[in-house]
A protein has these predicted regions:
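N-terminal accessory/pre-domain segments preceding catalytic cores
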Residues: 1-153, 166-169, 179, 189-190, ...
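N-terminal export/assembly leaders
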Residues: 152-161
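Conserved helix-adjacent loop modules within structured domains
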Residues: 156-157, 170-174
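A generic short-segment signal for beta-strand/edge and adjacent turn/coil regions
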Residues: 163-165, 172-175
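A conserved hydrophobic secondary-structure block that centers on an alpha-helix together
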Residues: 173-182, 187
Length: 207
C-alpha cells in the first residue's frame, strides 16, 4: 500500500515542471527565469494556471503581484480571479522608489486581504463606485471608512464566521464586522489607496 501511495506521489511530482522545463518556458516567452522559477516551484500542481497568467499580462506587474501571494495561494489561485486583479489595477507609477513599489504591490495590487476566498472584486468596484464618489474617497478615505462603518452589522446569519466577499457585502449593504474590514480594504485598494487589516490587532489601516 505504501509503495502504491509513493508511486502516486512520485507521478504527481513529475508533472510539475523542473528547472530545465521552466527555463525553456521562460526562454520561449521572454520571461526572467530567476523570478519565475521560485513561483513555479511553489505553485506545484497549479503550474498551468501560473504559466497561463504569466503569458497573458505584463511581466513586471504580474510577477510582483504573484510574489504578494502565499505559497498556498499560488497552489490554489484561479487564472480568472488573477485576471481581474491584474487588468483592473494600474501599474505602479514609474516615479516610485523601490520601497514605494513594494508597498504598492503589497497593499494595493495584492488580491489577498486576510483569510477570505480570493474573489474578483476590482472590476466590480470599478463599475459600482461612481467617478464622483471615487474622487471623493481618494481625497478623503475617512469618508469611505464612515460609509462602511454605517452599514448594518449582521449578527444572525453567519454563525460559522465565514468570510463574505467584498462584492457581496457591498451589494447587500449588510455584513459582519470581518466583512466590513474586508469591504473597506477592497474598496480602498480598488481606488489605489494602500490599505490592510493589521495581522496583530485586526484593525483596518490605510495610507
Amino acid at each position: 500500500r505504501r509503495a502504491h501511495e509513493d508511486s502516486i506521489r512520485t507521478a504527481y511530482v513529475k508533472t510539475v515542471p523542473d528547472s530545465a522545463e521552466t527555463a525553456a518556458f521562460c526562454q520561449s516567452h521572454g520571461l526572467d527565469f530567476a523570478a519565475v522559477r521560485p513561483l513555479m516551484a511553489k505553485a506545484c500542481g497549479n503550474w498551468q494556471a501560473l504559466e497561463q497568467t504569466l503569458c497573458a499580462y505584463p511581466e513586471q506587474k504580474t510577477i510582483a503581484t504573484l510574489r504578494t501571494l502565499s505559497d498556498k495561494d499560488l497552489r490554489d489561485f484561479s487564472p480568472a480571479v488573477l485576471a481581474d486583479h491584474l487588468t483592473a489595477t494600474p501599474d505602479a507609477p514609474a516615479a516610485f522608489s523601490a520601497a514605494a513599489r513594494t508597498l504598492y504591490y503589497k497593499y494595493v495590487s495584492c488580491p489577498r486581504i486576510a483569510n477570505e476566498l480570493l474573489t474578483p472584486w476590482r472590476s466590480f468596484f470599478a463599475k459600482n463606485i461612481s467617478k464622483k464618489e471615487a474622487a471623493r474617497f481618494r481625497a478623503a478615505p475617512a469618508d469611505m471608512a464612515d460609509k462602511v462603518r454605517r452599514l448594518p452589522i449582521d449578527t444572525l446569519w453567519n454563525p460559522q464566521g465565514y468570510c463574505e466577499s467584498p462584492a457581496s457585502a457591498f451589494t447587500f449593504g449588510i455584513t459582519d464586522r470581518k466583512g466590513k474590514a474586508l469591504l473597506f480594504v477592497a474598496m480602498a485598494r480598488s481606488l489605489g489607496i494602500p490599505a490592510r487589516i493589521d495581522e496583530v490587532t485586526g484593525k483596518v489601516q490605510y495610507l
